[in-house]
Amino acid sequence: MDIIKGNLDGISKPASNSRIRPGSRSSNASLEVLSTEPGSFKVDTASNLNSGKEDHSESSNTENRRTSNDDKQESCSEKIKLAEEGSDEDLDLVQHQIISECSDEPKLKELDSQLQDAIQKMKKLDKILAKKQRREKEIKKQGLEMRIKLWEEIKSAKYSEAWQSKEEMENTKKFLSLTAVSEETVGPSHEEEDTFSSVFHTQIPPEEYEMQMQKLNKDFTCDVERNESLIKSGKKPFSNTEKIELRGKHNQDFIKRNIELAKESRNPVVMVDREKKRLVELLKDLDEKDSGLSSSEGDQSGWVVPVKGYELAVTQHQQLAEIDIKLQELSAASPTISSFSPRLENRNNQKPDRDGERNMEVTPGEKILRNTKEQRDLHNRLREIDEKLKMMKENVLESTSCLSEEQLKCLLDECILKQKSIIKLSSERKKEDIEDVTPVFPQLSRSIISKLLNESETKVQKTEVEDADMLESEECEASKGYYLTKALTGHNMSEALVTEAENMKCLQFSKDVIISDTKDYFMSKTLGIGRLKRPSFLDDPLYGISVSLSSEDQHLKLSSPENTIADEQETKDAAEECKEP
């Protein structure tokens, strides 16, 4: 930017973009040369008008369009007049400006349409916001009315002193002290007014928003009229911008606020210094209220002290002591009766106590204490009963102590020895027929004696049978060998058959009888096994006697295990009868 010193008295037109020429009228004056800005005057006026249009209605927008077109025509005519008075160079500049302004007109129209659409959207959103704020306001009023009704009902309610407790009284007082402030604020005089004040200075109430919009529209129309008069007179039309700047201080406050908020962007709750001060004031009021409540409660809340709880009266202590003494006496006399007696006595003692308690006034804390006391009593009774049952079991076990395994074995051995001695004595009696014999051992019952005698007889019979079996078996073996040799004398035998017979039956054959013939070998083998129909030696009378003896041996072998089982049962019965005396 070039600055030339000189006088500016002769200048009566806006600054141009041309430099000084020695042949012009204004050659003796100095001018300030600036950078080229085509249509600067038009842009300034358009920006001022657009800033005012944001708060104007649709009807005023149409009027502004007409006035703006008139202003353009008038400005063009004025510029032409000024150019005629000036030099030829000024004429060229004015023509250039007029052409640029005419070319910018469609662009400005597009901007106007976009701004109008944005303004309409903002108005719709403002209406929605205003409706929601009104709804919220109505809900808050309804809540206050409900609180006032509740407060009045609590005041009007008259509780009977019989069942009202201290806790309920204190709670009602606290509730009334909290709701008293809200009741005072809302009344018949305050119903029409706005009960809610804005927390921060930047908040605009919804009712004032419409009034403010109407005022802005009126101011905008007045400013447009003044601008028209200024343009006609040829003066500078910057008064509108100055007024808009005065009205835009509120917007500048928002800019400052945004700058302050940007500084504290790291904090979780972003607030301005003014908002912080306002919060501190509000919190102070709350702290004062809390301190007042705590001081008022401190005087009246002396009853909230930790106490032991339910305490028995002196008469109840005496009754319990008497019951304990009776229980001890009964337990010493008869342990079985003592386990049932405490229940009956406690039931009988509880009946008059319960009747007396019903007549007394019931408070909320006493019910819980009674229930806990009853539960304790039941637990204590059950413990006492369990202990007594354990004692009874221990006494029974001590009285009837069980025998060990060693003791039982010793007793069984003694019984067996006694039985053996009895058997010997019985056998001696039979042989010698002695009648008068003094018993060395303790006397036994007749049944046991008869059993023992039967056992001795069976044993004797067994021994005799075994001896007879041994003799018969020896005779049978001799006879079998004899008959086999007799059967094979008249037949030819091979060497293999002879060796088998010698190995199995220990028989000896003469070498003359042995014949090495394969046919005779197989025939003699079948005869040795005994698969012929009926040999001649079976007709011998001695063969039948040997068969009968072998069948009797088998019968005795089968009956022997049954006799042993019976003998064992008889010994057990004798041992049990020995224990009984």
From Swiss-Prot:
Residues 52-77, 344-360, 569-581 have a biased composition (Basic and acidic residues). It comes from the Eukaryota. The modification Phosphoserine is found at residue 87. It holds the Pfam family FSIP1. Residues 105-153 form a coiled coil. Residues 1-77, 338-365, 555-581 are annotated as: Disordered. Residues 14-30 have a biased composition (Polar residues). Keywords: Coiled coil, Phosphoprotein. This is Fibrous sheath-interacting protein 1. Belongs to the FSIP1 family.
